[in-house]
């Protein structure tokens, strides 16, 4: 038999497919080989060709999946980071190893270049590392964790069990996340469900039975379903805690701990937050495995385009100062805004069209991307201040929106949307409320209440002067806030300019402090006083805000001791009350002298008491009186105080001379430390061990001490220096300010140690009365009649009274109502025997049979529309009369139907509006068809 001709196509063993795999990869070394002549190879009988089976007999399927995923990622990547090659500058999503379908979805959504948080987090997440990301809402953090999730999950799994879990603090944020997942998941068959409070539990039972891939939920409802359905979470590979600081603030810590206990240890956990409270750091240490902290350096620095102005005011002038800044400095217009006028001008037909209305709102948002000179955000201390300022500014005629932590979610969304679309120009918020809001680029930021930490100041003013645009921040500083201002000045490392000490002031590089013009400020203060006298509601709101401020000041962080000492000198100086350099052109020399005179009168303190004045004038009746005992006691106290002042002054002079002599003797020994520690405040001894550990991690104290010791070798140093250079470690660093490190640590270089990285990034915001227990007595008791004793009233408020709380699997207390038996009743009603276990094959069409939405949110549901004749009432039943009346009413309704339309239905007679509308539709059809009328 003649031999068979060789096949023109090469076999799998002779054809190299690497060229086809990497044909678009410019960095691949593989090249397409030319076809070679086929050689005849004699067959080897009884040869076992299963080499892979013998070599990899012990390997698992997970290793194969990891190998395939790695190869596919390298094939998708346009430019690999190989030796001698670097990724292109400004590389987009193509350089991250994403598949083609996901890249198309990203381009369809309008993402061309990744945001900074996306550029930093996505490569780390793709390497299966746990990540703690600090980013505000609006920075693209939602896509930063959704894109890697879709890339990792790829397609729907036929094995039962969810693989992705996203926990959000509110229903609105969960809906927003679901929308992003749906848009980026186009082209895949991934199923996603939304589990939030307020929806039907039975429908959510059907959703979970439909084997979703991604679960987007709030912690309370997801824990309820977990306990009720006895869910097995061992299949989850990807967990995201979105707005984690908000989750802890709303009291979801117990729910998160219980959920975290049921997750597998092999999961990948991501945690995104706007700030990093201490409680969140502890949670991350316990729930994440060697996490990586991702924090943008740009969010920890003040923009160089930001100009700052600090105004010294008195407590009674704060409202007037705020109005003066809005009216005279920002030139804020009063009355309705242009956006609100445009909405009023629209006809009723346009307002009824939802699609057109939504398009107009989106167009308004896009127009708001470039800041106007009137968009302003005002930061207040508590929610009571927010309510008070909102009412006061509304009374002044401004268009205002307000947001605080405990505000209803729907109202919060409406208020923020009004500000974004330009319906209002001013947004009054608290630090807690503004932390995660997607606020557009602003032109002005006003600190009505000065922040207690430099971090919070940076967090506030970081919303303006973005993308190369100019911005202003105005801060009202009282005498009690001066220490915090000096702490901020030390942290920023800028020059402090009081009043008109310098003719040339750079508001972007200096901390310029001064007062507002007295004439304009007095007018606004008089207007505020008149409003408070006329409006009882605003007066009551001010009283409540004053009480809330007292509680806020009790919990506020204390300023440094050195700044408190300097603040006394700064506040008592004449330049503290001088006119701010911002108003230098407006005030003439005569006005400046007038301001100085008013400042002297305002700061006048009498040297004599009323008793001394009366005695000098001859008593109350104008005649000389005998020496009074009160007057004698006052004189004795005054003489004692004057003697103490003299002693203190002499002691200070003696100490100064002693220090001068010591500096001359040991000048060489302390010359090195003196220059380095010139700006170190005195409260450095209060630094904790963690702060010292962070500081000393990049500083070699032994070398520094040995260097100072070598420079100070003399005969007199052994009696002066007490430290042993071999063992002594100084508590102050020689090259950096520890106060700056404590205030805000900008990470640089390696970030391998999460604990040390989070110490500098931790920031706790003061509550704005939104937190439970703020301003309330800690122990509220009530009398328990049954047990004859006092018990805590907190049990009645959080549901822990009696047996309403049970311990979950992790030991945390959860509500006992989570296990109510509704899932068993639902299974019985749906005639479901047993749902598939995790890892088993899913049942096709199970979700549709159970009445779910097929694994998606917002699916169509069956509705009963058929009408049947009512059954006749049974005389033997107890509700015979009731059923008889129902049957008669149903027969009357059926008898009233004429021609299929009820008596209450729409009339078929056309009115003038119907005829006019029909003519318009007919004319539109004629124009659309573009056909001439038929000739008769």
Swiss-Prot record:
Catalysed reactions listed for this entry: ATP + H2O = ADP + phosphate + H(+)
Domain notes: The Q motif is unique to and characteristic of the DEAD box family of RNA helicases and controls ATP binding and hydrolysis.
Name of the molecule in the record: ATP-dependent RNA helicase dbp10
Segments crossing the lipid bilayer: none
InterPro entries attached to this UniProt entry: DBP10_C, DDX54/DBP10_DEAD-box_helicase, DEAD/DEAH_box_helicase_dom, DEAD_box_RNA_helicase, Helicase_ATP-bd, Helicase_C-like, P-loop_NTPase, RNA-helicase_DEAD-box_CS
Job of this protein: ATP-binding RNA helicase involved in the biogenesis of 60S ribosomal subunits and is required for the normal formation of 25S and 5.8S rRNAs.
GO MF entry, a single one: ATP hydrolysis activity
Any one biological process term the GO annotation gives: rRNA processing
Basic residues bias locations: 917-936
Residue ranges occupied by any Helicase C-terminal domain in the UniProt entry: 360-511
Gene, per the UniProt record: dbp10
Binding site for ATP: 135-142
Family: Belongs to the DEAD box helicase family. DDX54/DBP10 subfamily.
Compartments, as annotated in UniProt: Nucleus, Nucleolus
EC top class, as a word: hydrolase
Biased composition regions of type Basic and acidic residues, renumbered to the chain: 341-352, 867-895, 907-916
UniProt key word Nucleotide-binding: yes
Region described as Disordered: 1-48, 337-363, 642-684, 701-721, 843-936
Biased segments, Low complexity type: 701-717, 896-906
Motif (DEAD box): 242-245
Location of the motif Q motif: 91-119
Keywords: ATP-binding, Helicase, Hydrolase, Nucleotide-binding, Nucleus, Ribosome biogenesis, RNA-binding, rRNA processing
Bias (Acidic residues): 663-675
Matches recorded under Gene3D superfamilies: P-loop containing nucleotide triphosphate hydrolases
Top-rank taxon: Eukaryota
Pfam families to which the protein is assigned, alphabetical: DBP10CT, DEAD, Helicase_C
The keyword Isomerase appears for this protein: no
């Amino acid at each position: 038999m003649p031999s068979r001709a060789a096949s023109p196509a090469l076999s799998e063993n002779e054809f190299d497919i690497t060229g086809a795999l990497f044909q678009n990869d410019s960095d691949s070394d593989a090249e397409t080989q030319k076809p070679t002549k086929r050689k005849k190879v004699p067959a080897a009988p009884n040869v076992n060709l299963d080499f892979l089976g013998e070599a990899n007999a012990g390997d698992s399927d997970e290793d194969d999946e990891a190998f395939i995923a790695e190869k596919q990622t390298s094939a998708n990547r346009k430019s690999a980071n190989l030796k001698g090659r670097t990724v292109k500058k400004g590389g987009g999503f193509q350089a991250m190893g994403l598949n083609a379908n996901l890249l198309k979805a990203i381009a369809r959504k309008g993402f061309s270049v990744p945001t900074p948080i996306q550029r930093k987090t996505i490569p780390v997440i793709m390497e299966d590392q746990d990540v703690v990301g600090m980013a505000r809402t609006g920075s693209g953090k939602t896509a930063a964790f959704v894109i890697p999730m879709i890339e990792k999950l790829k397609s729907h799994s036929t094995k039962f069990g969810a693989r992705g879990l996203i926990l959000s603090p509110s229903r609105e944020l969960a809906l927003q996340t679901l929308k992003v997942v749906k848009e980026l998941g186009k082209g895949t068959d991934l199923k996603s469900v939304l589990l939030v409070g307020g929806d039907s539990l039975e429908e959510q039972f059907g959703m979970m039975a439909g084997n979703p891939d991604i679960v987007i939920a709030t912690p309370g409802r997801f824990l309820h379903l977990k306990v009720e359905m006895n869910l097995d979470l061992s299949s989850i590979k990807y967990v995201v805690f979105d707005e984690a600081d908000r989750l802890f603030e709303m009291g979801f810590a117990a729910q998160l701990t219980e959920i975290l206990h049921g997750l597998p240890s092999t999961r990948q956990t991501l945690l995104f937050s706007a700030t990093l409270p201490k409680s969140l750091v502890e949670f991350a240490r316990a729930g994440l495995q060697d996490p990586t902290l991702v924090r943008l350096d740009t969010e920890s620095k003040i923009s160089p385009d930001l100009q700052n102005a600090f105004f010294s005011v008195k407590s009674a002038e704060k409202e007037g100062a705020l109005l003066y800044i809005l009216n005279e400095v920002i030139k804020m217009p009063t009355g309705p805004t242009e956006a609100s006028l445009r909405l009023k001008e629209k006809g009723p037909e346009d307002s009824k069209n939802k699609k057109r209305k939504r398009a107009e709102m989106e167009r308004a948002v896009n127009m708001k991307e470039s800041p106007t000179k009137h968009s302003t955000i005002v930061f207040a201390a508590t929610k009571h201040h927010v309510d008070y300022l909102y009412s006061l500014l509304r009374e002044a005629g401004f268009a205002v929106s307000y947001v605080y932590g405990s505000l209803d979610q729907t109202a919060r969304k409406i208020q923020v949307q009004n500000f974004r679309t330009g319906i209002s120009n001013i947004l009054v918020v608290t630090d807690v409320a503004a932390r995660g809001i997607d606020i557009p680029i602003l032109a002005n930021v006003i600190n009505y209440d000065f922040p207690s930490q430099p971090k919070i100041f940076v967090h506030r003013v970081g919303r303006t002067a973005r993308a190369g645009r100019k911005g202003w921040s105005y801060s009202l500083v009282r005498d009690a806030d001066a220490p915090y201002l000096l702490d901020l000045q030390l942290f920023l490392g800028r020059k402090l300019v009081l009043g008109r000490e310098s003719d040339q002031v750079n508001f972007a590089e200096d901390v310029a402090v001064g007062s507002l013009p007295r004439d304009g400020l007095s007018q606004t203060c008089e207007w505020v006083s008149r409003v408070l006298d006329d409006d009882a509601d605003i007066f009551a709101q001010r009283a409540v805000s004053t009480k809330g401020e007292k509680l806020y000041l009790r919990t506020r962080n204390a300023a440094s001791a050195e700044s408190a000492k300097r603040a006394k000198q700064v506040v008592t100086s004449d330049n503290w009350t001088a006119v701010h350099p911002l108003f230098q052109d407006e005030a003439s020399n005569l006005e400046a002298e007038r301001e100085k005179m008013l400042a002297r009168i305002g700061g006048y303190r009498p040297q004599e008491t009323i008793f001394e004045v009366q005695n000098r004038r001859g008593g109350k009746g104008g005649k000389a009186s005998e020496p009074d005992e009160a007057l004698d006691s006052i004189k004795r106290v005054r003489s004692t105080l004057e003697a103490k002042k003299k002693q203190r002054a002499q002691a200070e002079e003696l100490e100064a001379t002693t220090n001068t002599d010591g500096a001359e003797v040991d000048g060489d020994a302390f010359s090195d430390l003196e220059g380095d520690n010139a700006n170190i405040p005195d409260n450095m001894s209060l630094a904790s061990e963690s702060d010292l550990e962070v500081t000393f991690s990049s500083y070699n104290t032994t070398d520094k001490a040995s260097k100072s010791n070598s420079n100070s070798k003399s005969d007199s140093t052994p009696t002066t220096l007490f430290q042993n250079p071999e063992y002594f470690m100084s508590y102050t660093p020689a090259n950096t300010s520890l106060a700056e490190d404590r205030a805000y640590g900008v990470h640089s270089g390696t970030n391998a140690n999460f604990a040390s990285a989070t110490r500098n990034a931790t920031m706790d915001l003061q509550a704005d009365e939104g937190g439970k227990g703020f301003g309330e007595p800690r122990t509220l008791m009530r009398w328990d009649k049954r047990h004859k004793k006092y018990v805590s009233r907190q049990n009645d408020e959080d549901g822990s009274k009696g047996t309403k709380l049970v311990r979950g699997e992790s030991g945390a207390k959860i509500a006992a109502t989570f296990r109510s038996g509704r899932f068993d009743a639902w299974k019985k009603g749906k005639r479901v025997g047993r749902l598939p276990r995790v890892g088993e094959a899913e049942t096709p069409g199970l979700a549709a049979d159970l009445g779910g939405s097929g694994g998606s949110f917002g699916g169509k549901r069956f509705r009963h529309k058929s009408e049947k004749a009512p059954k006749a009432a049974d005389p033997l039943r107890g509700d015979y009369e009731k059923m008889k009346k129902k049957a008669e009413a149903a027969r009357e309704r059926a008898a009233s139907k004429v021609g299929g339309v009820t008596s209450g239905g729409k009339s078929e007679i056309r009115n003038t509006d119907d005829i006019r509308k029909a003519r318009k539709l007919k004319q539109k059809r004629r124009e659309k068809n573009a056909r001439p009328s038929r000739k008769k």
